[in-house]
């Protein structure tokens, strides 16, 4: 199985919502998030619970829990070999609809212009 390319979503202003969220996390949570992203690279569409789950409208979540806090990384697939990370959040019970809606909007913008909305580190 070939690896899935994982890209990060970039806003119009050049900012990356995932990086902004990730940089504020404790080191242990960052490590677990990184491991989930690696599993996404390895497994792609085949990644399932408890590591990932489908939410709705083409949006999936990577699931990370540590110390009773449930962190989620929302992502979507673009083509057969790319997963695009929209953003991350901490949640209590279910992922709020507004967060899924935000990911859906980012998915639409990305699909309209992938090059413009792919984050590249400087």
Specify the residue positions occupied by each region the protein language model found.
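Basic, Lys/Arg-enriched alpha-helical interface segments
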Residues: 1-70, 79-83, 89-122
